[in-house]
Amino acid sequence: SVTSGSPVVAIEGDSAFGFSGMEIETICRYNLPVTIVIFNNGGIYRGDGVDLSGAGAPSPTDLLHHARYDKLMDAFRGVGYNVTTTDELRHALTTGIQSRKPTIINVVIDPAAGTESGHITKLNPKQVAGN
């Protein structure tokens, strides 16, 4: 995008965005034609909602539900969309790419939809939780 001027579409989950999200400052500072699509299911792999410690804390695989990642663009003068339907996604993606402005599309998806691609919760077996 920097040298070619071509639009870029980055597709990631809400967990991945947690690691790289502040790159939006650079994207906005250079006014790059980057559209970031965040599939937001409220968790790592989808979150399991199980608190193994018994302390009432959120599960380590749960993220803040209903997070509005699109609102981050207000701070950096980019464009943000929050979408919940395929029609809204189609519109936001088309508009974001065509505008050539830094854009985040927060795509709220059902946490139970699809299949888990990994088993991070297996890293914390129940027999050692809370020890």
Predicted feature locations:
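Thiamine diphosphate
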Residues: 1-131
